């Protein structure tokens, strides 16, 4: 009980509440007395400084400039780092506040995120200069010599990679593509002609 790191006497208590967003809360001392104010700068932690409600803590008491007692050098039992609100809980901890930020714009779904939605990967098929099949500049997917294409090859679906949005984003995204922007033969999978002109005997 007298692990005196800061010269004062270590006391024990439990966290009454702690607002992670605002960075402060109160501790109820085990030996009675008034609840003590605690600021996140007084927390001994590995990483994000927060406290979980009802968490057992040890601390020292200091009188602040307004002559009020406050808890400082707050740690877990036996001087261990506090557990805190590292996963969420009341307003957030590490993730919480804006955590995961994936929904709306960017980051996955929505407008222009990494793959889905309107802009998707290739800028929504808005005439970029790189081939959707192989990623090389200088030619379009329909003229690409790399395999793919065909009924489900390459980007999957009818036109595999070619077409409106090509491999990933945009309108036709890998799936329907084809039709609208050239693409490959449905019968043999080769580019440069349509199924009705195919000489490979598919139909």
Curated annotation (Swiss-Prot):
Residues in CSD domain copies: 12-76
ZnF (CCHC-type) residues: 129-146, 183-200
Chief place where the protein resides: cytoplasm
Tissue: Mostly expressed in shoot apices, seeds and siliques, and, to a lower extent, in roots, cotyledons, stems, shoots, leaves, floral buds and flowers. Present in shoot apical meristems and siliques (at protein level).
Null allele phenotype: Early flowering, altered stamen number and impaired seed development.
Region described as Disordered: spans on this chain: 65-127
Annotated InterPro entries: CSD (IPR011129), CSD_CS (IPR019844), CSP_DNA-bd (IPR002059), NA-bd_OB-fold (IPR012340), Znf_CCHC (IPR001878), Znf_CCHC_sf (IPR036875)
PTM sites of type N-acetylserine: 2
Gene Ontology biological process terms from the UniProt entry: cold acclimation; regulation of cellular respiration; response to abscisic acid; response to cold; response to desiccation; response to water deprivation; seed development; stamen development
UniProt keyword Transit peptide, yes or no: no
Comp. bias intervals (Gly residues): 85-127
One protein family per Pfam: CSD
Compartments, record wording: Cytoplasm; Nucleus, Nucleolus
Induction remarks: Induced by abscisic acid (ABA), transiently by ethylene, salicylic acid and water fload, but down-regulated by dehydration stress. Accumulates during cold acclimation. Accumulation during silique development is AGL15-dependent.
SUPFAM superfamilies per the UniProt record, alphabetical: Nucleic acid-binding proteins, Retrovirus zinc finger-like domains
Protein name in the entry: Cold shock protein 2
Organism: Arabidopsis thaliana
Gene: CSP2
């Amino acid at each position: 009980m007298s692990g005196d790191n800061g010269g004062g006497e270590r006391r024990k208590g439990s966290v009454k509440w702690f607002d992670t967003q605002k960075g402060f809360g109160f501790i109820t001392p085990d030996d009675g007395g008034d609840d003590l104010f605690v600021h996140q700068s007084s927390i001994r932690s590995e990483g994000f400084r927060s406290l979980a409600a009802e968490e057992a803590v040890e601390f020292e008491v200091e009188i602040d400039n307004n002559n009020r007692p406050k808890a400082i050098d707050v740690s877990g039992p036996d001087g261990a780092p506090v557990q805190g609100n590292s996963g969420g809980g009341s307003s957030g901890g590490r993730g919480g506040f804006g955590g995961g930020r994936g929904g709306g714009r960017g980051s996955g779904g929505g407008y222009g995120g990494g793959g889905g939605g309107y802009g998707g990967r290739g800028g929504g098929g808005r005439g970029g200069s790189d081939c959707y099949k192989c990623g090389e500049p200088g030619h379009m997917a329909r003229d690409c010599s790399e395999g793919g294409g065909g009924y489900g090859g390459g980007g999957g679906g009818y036109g595999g990679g070619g077409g409106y949005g090509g491999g990933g984003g945009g309108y036709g995204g890998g799936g329907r593509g084809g039709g609208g922007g050239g693409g490959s033969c449905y019968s043999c999978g080769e580019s440069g002609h349509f199924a009705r002109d195919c000489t490979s005997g598919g139909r």
